[in-house]
């Protein structure tokens, strides 16, 4: 297995286990590689749009659907608290973990708190809409804004 694949899997496993982003050092330990090699793997994964990194080039901002930073899109699966990058990704966390969960967020227009149970088959029917200001083809122009 390539170092890039090992790195990606180590990152996602850490997020799944803890709900938090791993440090560069933790990933290096998990893949039994030196920090500089893992840093290079991060750069390649970023170029492939697998990761979004903070300006320091080593802190993980996003490993979709997981967010490396606290925000309004909270997902609880079992007893673990995760942050999603957006409303769309909040549905992806229970799917990625193959576990039911509860999404807590708020309506961007009204500020109304939102909470929804997500089962293994997806969310129940509801009247909510997901609206994104940026067309999907342009999301990666500025994925953090999107």
Indicate residue ranges for each PLM-predicted region.
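Short amphipathic alpha-helical interface segments
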Residues: 2-20
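Mid-protein regulatory/catalytic core that forms ligand/cofactor-binding pockets
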Residues: 79-146
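Amphipathic alpha-helical interaction segments
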Residues: 18, 49-52, 100
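Short, cationic-aromatic polyanion-contact patches
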Residues: 1-5, 23, 53-77, 120
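Short acidic, hydrophobic short linear motifs in intrinsically disordered regions
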Residues: 17-30
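Basic amphipathic alpha-helical segments that dock to polyanions
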Residues: 7, 27, 37-54
């Amino acid at each position: 297995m390539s170092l890039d694949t090992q790195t990606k899997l180590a990152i996602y496993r850490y997020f799944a286990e803890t709900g938090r982003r791993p440090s560069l050092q933790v990933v290096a330990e998990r893949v039994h590689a030196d920090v500089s090699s893992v840093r290079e793997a991060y750069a390649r994964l970023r170029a492939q749009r697998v990761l979004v990194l903070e300006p320091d080039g080593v802190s993980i901002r996003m490993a979709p659907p997981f967010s490396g930073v606290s925000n309004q899109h909270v997902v609880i699966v079992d007893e673990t608290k995760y942050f999603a990058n957006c409303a769309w990704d909040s549905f992806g966390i229970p799917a990625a973990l193959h576990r039911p969960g509860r999404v807590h967020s708020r309506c961007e227009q009204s500020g109304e708190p939102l909470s929804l149970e997500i089962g293994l088959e997806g969310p129940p029917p509801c009247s909510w809409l997901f609206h994104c200001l940026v067309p999907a083809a342009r999301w990666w122009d500025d994925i953090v804004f999107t």
